[in-house]
From Swiss-Prot:
GO biological process terms, semicolon-separated: translation
Compositionally biased tracts (Gly residues): 84-100
Biased composition (Basic and acidic residues): 37-52
Protein name: Small ribosomal subunit protein bS21
Name of encoding gene: rpsU
């Protein structure tokens, strides 16, 4: 992978490289290859991902057809870039779905 450095601006080039790597899915693949995944676990994960994609596609289709209400967009600047920032218990080690 290659990125041009313009005017010795390394920060901008690094940002562009990270963006390219994110688009290519390199970070995700590194995370998956960080440890061994049994074939049965891989199969289960891929099946779950396929189900998730199908549900998302169906939900989007229903929203386009007007059968489901559109998800309200947050006000500009509200909780941008902070997953799980809104909601109760988000600061006490709870994930986006709450404590487990």
């Amino acid at each position: 992978m290659q990125v041009l450095v313009r005017d010795n601006n390394v920060d901008q080039a690094l940002k562009a490289l990270k963006k390219k790597m994110q688009r290519e899915g390199i970070f995700r693949e590194m995370k998956l290859r960080g440890h061994y995944e049994k074939p049965s676990e891989k199969k289960a994960r891929e099946k779950a991902e396929a189900v998730r994609r199908a549900r998302k596609l169906a939900r989007k289709k229903l929203q386009r057809e007007g059968l489901l209400p559109m998800k309200p967009k947050p006000a500009f600047g509200a909780d941008r870039g902070r997953p799980g920032a809104a909601g109760a218990g988000a600061g006490a080690g709870a994930g986006p779905r709450g404590p487990r």
